[in-house]
């Protein structure tokens, strides 16, 4: 694989990781990502909630969790409480309803700080990928000096593109958090 293609793949992976991280930030709207990674102790082992139940959005402020096995309702409720997500599960027979509370201004400010920190971490990761690629280029004795400069320019363009995408995602998420 060429250095350029490898670099782009690593940067795309960093971007995907960032997307997954910020998806879990609570904006006050119900979204399955809020709870799908919660771990639940069932069958003598620990499993992710998304493997034990279907998670759907009833309305903008409510999630509905339908366990595949109705015997797991109490274990799922305990897992959600233990995850410290500030969510209160309400078991109604074989389903669990979770009302998403309105975030406070203090909570929003804290989440925005976390968002900015995660955004900067993602950009640092992308810049580290750029540095590694540039180091590989310089060590490659088959390339001429002009070819190295051209590749470095393309790598910088990739870096700028991915950093810009991170900034745009951060601004969008920050707007979502601020408009609640």
UniProtKB/Swiss-Prot annotation:
Q: Which spans of this chain does the record mark as coiled coil?
A: none
* UniProt-listed Pfam families: RRF (PF01765)
Which GO-annotated molecular functions does the record name?
ribosomal large subunit binding
Q: What's the main place this protein lives?
A: cytoplasm
Kindly state a single biological-process term from the GO annotations of this entry.
Answer: translational termination
From the Swiss-Prot or TrEMBL record, state where the protein is found. Answer: Cytoplasm
For this UniProt entry, what's an example GO CC term?
cytoplasm
Q: Which HAMAP family match?
A: RRF
Q: Which PANTHER family match?
A: MITOCHONDRIAL RIBOSOME RECYCLING FACTOR PSEUDO 1 (PTHR20982:SF3), RIBOSOME RECYCLING FACTOR (PTHR20982)
Q: What does this protein do?
A: Responsible for the release of ribosomes from messenger RNA at the termination of protein biosynthesis. May increase the efficiency of translation by recycling ribosomes from one round of translation to another.
Protein name from the UniProt record: Ribosome-recycling factor
């Amino acid at each position: 694989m060429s250095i350029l293609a490898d670099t782009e793949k690593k940067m795309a992976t960093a971007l995907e990781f960032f997307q997954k991280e910020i998806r879990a930030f609570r904006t006050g709207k119900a979204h399955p990502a809020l709870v799908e990674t919660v771990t639940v102790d069932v069958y003598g082992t620990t499993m992710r909630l998304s493997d034990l139940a279907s998670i759907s959005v009833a309305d903008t402020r409510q999630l509905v969790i339908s366990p595949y096995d109705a015997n797991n309702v109490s274990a799922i409720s305990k897992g959600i409480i233990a995850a410290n997500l500030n969510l209160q599960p309400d078991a109604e027979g074989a389903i669990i309803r979770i009302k998403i509370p309105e975030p406070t201004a203090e909570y929003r400010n804290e989440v925005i700080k976390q968002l900015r920190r995660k955004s900067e971490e993602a950009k640092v990761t992308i810049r580290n990928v750029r540095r590694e690629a540039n180091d590989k280029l310089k060590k490659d004795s088959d390339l001429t000096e002009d070819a190295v400069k051209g590749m470095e320019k393309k790598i910088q363009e990739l870096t700028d593109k991915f950093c810009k995408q991170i900034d745009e995602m951060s601004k969008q998420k920050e707007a979502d958090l601020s408009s609640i």
